[in-house]
């Protein structure tokens, strides 16, 4: 029997608008939208939830949006800002697992089946990811947890905004029965209308049709529909990036005022780091990194070229870094660099 997969789908809430809201808090209590600033030919990219209460939606022509909400504030898109925020969020994903499949700037699938931390609980991992995103960006996202990509994506939309919805393997059958077929991956307006003409509106309706009938009516997609109606989706999470580093860090409630206090934290950090490392990571080490953040949020780091994870090297880096940054330390991070990068890149803060 194959191992039950644990898939998380993270979808940031009204991402472009939320980034703008964070940059300009005065927008928080006002209806506004991003994109579509040309009132005649523009199309809304996204909007905040206040604007949605007026009926404004993504991909809506600006002229219609303004009719629904005359006080709607329109902002130009700032993709540089969105990409920078997205990069921070994506790095958070990779700190939990290598198996990340980004779908866009604001959403991704993560396969956490083999993640040992958080008691190997996908629910606890999803909670931790959401919290880490909020801690580092001030933004909220919604998470869906399920045994496959199809259901994880559907689940992430259920408790928006800032939601978390879990579908366990035991709940799959009961969950899909009442699920509208329009929620299924690949079912657009044409397919939905075609299914409606066949008296199919829910997955339970769809389950009554044979595989042969669905293939006859929908071709190759008919096989997918047959499986999706039963909550079956064998699509893998396809990573698109080779991981360049693995790191862990701890923020401490009390300042670390001495070198000895910093060194005392090394064993726990080392254990956390090794628990995240795979056999391939050990084979690919090209550098070791230590970083500090002090109580004034000053950040410093040191990197050493190395082919193995050596506690002595980590200890020496902590000693050297402490001499350079003689302040009370609030955060310590340690990590490894992976793959083929040049010496100049090794000096970068991780």
Curated annotation (Swiss-Prot):
Poorly processive, error-prone DNA polymerase involved in untargeted mutagenesis. Copies undamaged DNA at stalled replication forks, which arise in vivo from mismatched or misaligned primer ends. These misaligned primers can be extended by PolIV. Exhibits no 3'-5' exonuclease (proofreading) activity. May be involved in translesional synthesis, in conjunction with the beta clamp from PolIII. PANTHER family: DNA POLYMERASE KAPPA, DNA REPAIR POLYMERASE UMUC / TRANSFERASE FAMILY MEMBER. Its cofactor is Mg(2+). Coiled coil: none annotated. CDD domains: PolY_Pol_IV_kappa (cd03586). The active site is at residue 107. It comes from Francisella philomiragia subsp. philomiragia (strain ATCC 25017 / CCUG 19701 / FSC 153 / O#319-036). Belongs to the DNA polymerase type-Y family. One of its GO terms (molecular function) is damaged DNA binding. The record marks 16 as: Substrate discrimination. It is found in: Cytoplasm. Gene3D superfamilies: 3.30.70.270, 3.40.1170.60, 5' to 3' exonuclease, C-terminal subdomain (1.10.150.20), DNA polymerase, Y-family, little finger domain (3.30.1490.100). Binds 2 magnesium ions per subunit. GO terms for biological process: DNA-templated DNA replication; error-prone translesion synthesis; SOS response. Residues 7-188 form the UmuC domain. Mg(2+) binds at residues 11, 106. It catalyses: DNA(n) + a 2'-deoxyribonucleoside 5'-triphosphate = DNA(n+1) + diphosphate. This is DNA polymerase IV. Its EC number is 2.7.7.7. Monomer.
């Amino acid at each position: 029997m194959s191992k039950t997969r644990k898939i998380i789908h993270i979808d940031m809430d009204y991402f472009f608008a939320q980034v703008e809201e964070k940059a300009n808090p005065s927008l928080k209590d006002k209806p506004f939208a991003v994109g579509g600033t040309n009132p005649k030919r523009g199309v809304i990219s996204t909007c905040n939830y206040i604007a949605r209460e007026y009926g404004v939606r993504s991909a809506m022509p600006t002229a219609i949006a303004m009719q629904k909400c005359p006080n709607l504030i329109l902002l130009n898109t700032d993709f540089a800002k969105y990409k920078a925020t997205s990069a921070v969020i994506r790095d958070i994903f990779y700190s939990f697992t290598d198996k990340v499949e980004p779908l866009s700037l604001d959403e991704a699938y993560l396969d956490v089946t083999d993640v040992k931390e958080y008691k190997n609980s996908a629910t606890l991992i999803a909670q931790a990811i959401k919290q880490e995103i909020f801690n580092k960006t001030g933004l909220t996202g919604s998470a869906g947890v399920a045994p496959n990509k199809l259901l994880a994506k559907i689940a992430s939309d259920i408790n928006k905004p800032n939601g978390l919805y879990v579908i366990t393997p035991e709940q799959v059958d009961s969950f899909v029965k009442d699920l509208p077929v329009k929620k299924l991956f690949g079912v657009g307006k044409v397919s939905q209308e075609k299914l409606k003409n066949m008296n199919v509106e829910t997955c339970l309706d769809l389950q009554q049709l044979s595989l042969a009938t669905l293939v006859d009516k929908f071709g190759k997609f008919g096989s997918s529909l047959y499986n999706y109606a039963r909550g079956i989706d064998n699509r893998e999470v396809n990573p698109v990036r080779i991981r360049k580093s693995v790191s862990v860090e701890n923020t401490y409630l009390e300042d670390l005022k001495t070198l000895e206090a910093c060194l005392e934290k090394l064993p726990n950090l080392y254990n956390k780091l090794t628990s995240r490392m795979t056999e391939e990571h050990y084979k690919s080490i090209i550098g070791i990194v230590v970083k500090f953040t002090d109580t004034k949020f000053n950040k410093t780091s040191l990197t050493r070229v190395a082919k193995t994870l050596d506690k002595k090297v980590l200890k020496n880096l902590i000693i050297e870094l402490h001499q350079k940054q003689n302040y009370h330390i609030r955060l310590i991070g340690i990590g490894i660099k992976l793959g083929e990068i040049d010496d100049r890149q090794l000096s970068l803060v991780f």
